[in-house]
Amino acid sequence: MIDHTGIATDHPTAARAFYDAVFAALGGGMLMEVPKEYTGGKMVIGYGRDQPVFWVSEQPAGPGRHTAFAASRAQVDAFYAAAMDAGGSDNGPPGLRPEYHADYYAAFVHDPDGNNIEAVCHAPA
């Protein structure tokens, strides 16, 4: 079981605005910002609902990563709209993905650093 994960960003201001919007749509938010005296002056912020589970760190971004967040169908739709409004780019609008399984309802966007970010619901309609 994964406790937390993270990504790097070359665009800290854009990444913060993007993930603030995305996590608000998923019922969460930015829960922690590591003081810059501990990070060499770089942004390190943690997002989640009850505890930080997704970290965004200002450092050279590597190859794009894929991260999927568990959501309801309504949250998948809200995630996609919020991500697009916050500067994300489309990588698959909300809808069923039967190639994965009959109830796989998801949306995919690229964040400002090109990471493939997904919200997914596995529950039947």
Model-derived features with residue positions:
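Extreme N-terminal starter segment of soluble prokaryotic enzymes
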Residues: 1-3
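Vicinal oxygen chelate
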Residues: 9-14, 68-112
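Long, continuous compositionally biased terminal/linker segments
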Residues: 38-80
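A cross-kingdom feature marking charged/low-complexity
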Residues: 108-122
